[in-house]
Each structure stands twice: as structure tokens, then as C-alpha cells.
Amino acid sequence: MPDYTLNPQSSMIGVQAGSWVARHQLKRVNILSVSFYSGTAGALRSWLVLALLIGLVGCSSMVTPEMKRLPDRVELTSVPFFRGNAYQSGPMVLASMLANQQVQTTPGLLDKPLQLPGAEDRLEQNMQKVAREYGFMVYPLDGQLHDLLTQVSAGYPVMLRFSQGSALWKSPRYAVLIGYNRVKETVLLNAGMDRRYSMSFSRFTSAWKEAGSWAVLVQSPRQLPANVDQQRWLQAAEALSKSGQEQAAGEAKRTLARGVK
């Protein structure tokens, strides 16, 4: 008959062997767990660093050294506002600029001088032409945001064109820049149906450049712009003279001569 009696020494060896295997497997599990969590933590740290860098880029300031010399916040609350989307808001914006110079007018009264409807493709040129016919200087500005804000800080609203709409559909729209907040990095526009329409510096600059970076002042011949460019002012005076406003053009030249002394 087979002997099924247990050998104590053999049993002890078996138990010890099983215990060693169990400890070895547990050690492997612990190593794998540490490796997994170490890898996960490393990946998480990498993502956090990347997110931080992206956030820093996204939050980078658009305030230039020129802007830092301007007041923190300006709003020209007295600029008249005419609401409307017709003809890219061109007649409304021009009426606002003329009314700001004490001209009694409305957008409807400007349709005929602007040759609307029919001359929508010449709206930019005709808006400047009509402003000159009223005896005003049309002074073009540089394609830099700080140049526009400098004029607003001096009390002069800026007539401009920017691109408005969604990513799928955009169209140019005329507007009047009436204010800004340098701390919040926002501008205020009278545009279309919106009075005091707020846009971030970055969003506005992009929309403005998409529409050609066009911006002008409509000034009395006696009103020199802030940091006036003499050559540009004289060219504006020449354009005013060619529109039949020789006396106003002469006044503009005399104003410059007095202002640069």
C-alpha cells in the first residue's frame, strides 16, 4: 500500500517555496504599480507644463510701450450714434463723424451724396469725398493699434472698417472707435446696431487687419491730430483743396505751421 504519510521536511520546503513565489509576485506587482503611477504622474506633469505654456502665450499682453504712455481708460461719450446695418453701416458712421463736428445731418441725408444704392463698391472713397465736401480734413492713420488709441486719448473718434461675423461668414463693416481700456485690453466701438460694442485688443486688431487696416480722422482744418505727421497732414490738405475747399485747405496748412513751432 502506498505510504501517504507527510514528510515534515518536504512540507516545510513546499511552504517556503510557495511563500517565496508569492513574495516575488507581490514584488513584481508593486514594481509595476510604481512604474505605472510614476509614468502617469510624469505624463500629467508634462501636460500641466504644456497647458501652462499655452496659457501664457494666450495671455500675452498686446500693450506696447507706446500704449503704456496713454491713459488707462478713455471713452468719448459725446460722439453721436446712428444705429443701422444698411450699406455696411457706412452712412451711419459718416453721419456720426460729421455730427461730431456739429454738422446737422442723418444717415438718410447722406445716401444720395454717397450715391447709394449703386455705388457700394466705392463706399470708402465716397465717404472721404463727402467729408471733404463739408470742408473737413480726412487724415489717414497708421496700421497700428496704438496710433488709433493715441487719437482717441486726445479726444478724436476714429472712423474705420473691420471684419464682422463668424468663421463661416464675414463681411466688412464701418464703425467708430470711441474708447478703450488699456488694463482690460479692450476697445469700444459704435458699430451697426451696437453702441459701445466691446472687443479685445487681439480680436479687434485681427478683424481690423482682415478688412485692410483702414482708419481715418475727420478733422476740422484747425484740429491737428495727436502726434501729427506733417507730410500726411499736408497731403490731406491737398486732397481737400482738390475737392473745391481751397480756403479750408489753406487754413489747415496755417494750423500746421502754428502747431509745429
PLM segments and residue spans:
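Low-complexity, intrinsically disordered or signal/transmembrane-proximal segments
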Residues: 4, 9, 16, 24-25, ...
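Serine/threonine-rich, low-complexity intrinsically disordered segments
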Residues: 7, 14-15, 33, 42
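Generic short N-terminal amphipathic or hydrophobic helices
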Residues: 11-12, 30, 39, 53
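Bacterial N-terminal signal peptides that target proteins for export
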Residues: 22-48
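C-terminal motif of bacterial Sec signal peptides marking the signal peptidase cleavage site
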Residues: 55-58
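Cysteine-nucleophile protease catalytic domains, especially the papain-like/related folds used
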Residues: 60-144, 148, 154, 223, ...
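Noncatalytic regulatory segments and standalone regulatory/sensor domains
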Residues: 60-63, 181-261
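Active-site-adjacent substructure of cysteine-protease-like catalytic cores
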Residues: 137-190
